[in-house]
Amino acid sequence: EADVQHILDAIESGNTTPEDIANLTVPDHYTGALLRQEDESMFDGVATRDRDPRKSLRIEDVPTPELGPGEALIAVMASSINYNTVWSSIFEPVSTFGFLRRYGRTSPLAKRHDLPYHVIGSDLAGVVLRTGPGVHAWKHGDEAVAHCQSVELESPLGHDDTMLDPEQRIWGFETNFGGLAQLALVKSNQLLDKPAHLTWEEAASPGLVNSTAYRQLVSRNGAGMKQGDIVLIWGASGGLGSYA
């Protein structure tokens, strides 16, 4: 029976062609870091500082999701931890299963995300294994990083700024099939070329924090900061603060 390890081994060999990737068998299951809906109440009455993610996070096999239009299945070579991951794992400020339920009600395709488990993680660097209908910019074998914003782009409000789209969500936090796993499901418009000079780990680290800092501080719809401005960065030691 095929498993994901043969895919990762092929990629790491360094001499695998796109045709080789296309011919690899994608298994019907993979391993991921996940939360279980049955554990939602495990920290009830426990102070935030005493909630231990090691008690809620599980490493388990889950079914490989079917690809929908505009989506890509990625072999994850590296991922990253951020506050979304911590919040998810301690069910604060709310359980992420509420996000999955609400998302699942929006369309038959989104219903795939409403499951009794949640594969989390909002960063990755990896290799495109398969693409869904309508994806033309990416093909199997492409090395990519994924940013965290999952957006439907059906509302005109998001055409100028996707942060204003009423259906924008954080992938792996408000959606399922996140990056802390062997495989991940993303929208193809989340993908960017992996910089060739970066390792997998280096490429996987900045996605969420870098894009968040840029959007909020530098972009025309953010604070409009520019070189030479004198600013105070509150909490500058973390990932987001460091990029800020």
Regions of interest found by a model, annotated:
Residues 198-244:
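Mid-domain Rossmann-like dinucleotide-binding core that forms the NAD(H)/NADP(H) cofactor-binding site
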Residues 30, 142, 228-230:
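Nucleotide donor/acceptor-binding cores
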Residues 92, 151-161, 175-188:
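A structural motif shared across PLP-dependent enzymes of the aminotransferase-like
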Residues 26-33:
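Short structural boundary motif marking the start of a folded domain
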Residues 63-80, 93-155, 195:
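Glycine-rich beta-strand-centered segment in the early N-terminal region that forms part
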Residues 185-193, 197:
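Structured surface patches comprising rigid loops and adjacent beta-strands/short helices at the edges
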Residues 10-11, 39-55, 92-114, 154-167, ...:
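Charged, glycine/proline-rich intrinsically disordered loops and linkers
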Residues 7-24, 40-78, 83, 111, ...:
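A short N-terminal beta-strand-loop micro-motif at the entrance of redox/enzyme domains
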